[in-house]
């Protein structure tokens, strides 16, 4: 496809030079460009195809970047990036040194607020609007948020706050596409997906009349309903009660409707009519039939041929850790009826699809509500059940107070299965699970386990399930190391590691590497060159202190290695144990540096951080001034 109009647009100022009648053609070109780009790089597709017209309309009507647009979650911001001067860099999307898959302030002045976790946009836009007013500047703060993100309490906390400011130039755009990553849940989403029909309107009005005698304030709602015939009965009332002027729902793919509606809203906002709320209905995957038919499959695809669509790949030779968890969950549920599965809107990503099919009465998707998920699981545990919360490591951060106050303080037996621990690659710093070890191991009653391979992951999940205290099992994204999983539900001894390799270096060069989780196998490879001992520690908490002492007694140097933050991490736990035992021995702590790691290929990122086998070997030699071992070359007859 030729991009006649799109090639003329280097920023929104160029966009605003177009005649309104040209916008539909631009939308066709922009949608085609998004599809072409993502098919070549991989990335988020369905959500971006669904926001093309909305993105065009926002930049056409509002004075960006003076008016601040905040994209909630941000994975739907590719059209925005293309229209704001980054069209020619889309080929670098989510690659090391390339542009991010999410809005990023350091990347463009049009990325007014960095996002990636959900439900933050309204708070940020409110802060921007009030900040501008404090500085005597006139601009509109705009939050674009999906219906899935509206299930999080933070969004409503922000709206409750925003409604207080009756003259604040602020706009919330609800992008109602009836789908977060997994189909959204909860009563709010049921209402958002239910466009008013004549029968629904009549039934609602009749119901209101019945309660007028006990709820006089509802009379005003009935009048508004009849006068304006609003398309969304419950949301209109709900959002207006928060202090917003509600408009909608309107077709989010109809520029003839979007542009004038937004123009009117902008004028009202700048004239001091207070916070505005626009409800648009869009379709994920819009314009690409394969994505329309299966938006979940096309949510975040790798490279593919748009003409053919995503083809089933050959069955991988190695299971992913997510698959290992999903299989274990079903097996344990079959063995123990107390098991309950809980996820905050990550059914597919966390490997719970089969569990939901087999055990629908024991599966709870609580929506994008991590705080609620943690406390909800605590409530289940109070009733003698054994909840397993499947959650990405990075998202557990959002429920930290609940983890401490509602679960650990009461010593409730909740299992936290932490997927995506460590670096995650293309999604970058916002999704990296690198802080879980420090923030978990400092909590009393909490156990923290770190499997080295697929079968050990299954065993440690079983170990966690058998405990009468809160537990966490962290495992990385992607395929394992190729170890077959055994069908038995076998637990491992609590707080005990193992020696995976005995070193035989000469005195003065004896190195012991204590490896945690995903770092065991790189450590084993490095140890071959160092002739070092390698311990698979398995537990961060309780730490195998006896093993630490044993290694210290028989070696000249100690090394810890983990795929996580070193400040307060597993290495810190080892140093604390050594100090408490009064042991002084040169110790090298390896892990991720004290900075945010950008997006890129995971193997490349680990190499840059010195956490591949070569990096581990190099760091050990440099720190302890070890000489290279002579390489034995087999004679050739």
UniProtKB/Swiss-Prot annotation:
Binding site for thiamine diphosphate: 75, 116-118, 148-149, 177, 288, 370
Keyword Hydrolase assigned: no
Cellular-component GO terms for this entry: cytosol
Binding site for Mg(2+): 147, 177
GO molecular function, one term: magnesium ion binding
Example GO biological process: isopentenyl diphosphate biosynthetic process, methylerythritol 4-phosphate pathway
Enzyme class, spelled out: transferase
HAMAP family: DXP_synth
Subunit note: Homodimer.
Similarity remark: Belongs to the transketolase family. DXPS subfamily.
Name listed for the protein in its UniProt record: 1-deoxy-D-xylulose-5-phosphate synthase
Organism: Cupriavidus metallidurans (strain ATCC 43123 / DSM 2839 / NBRC 102507 / CH34) (Ralstonia metallidurans)
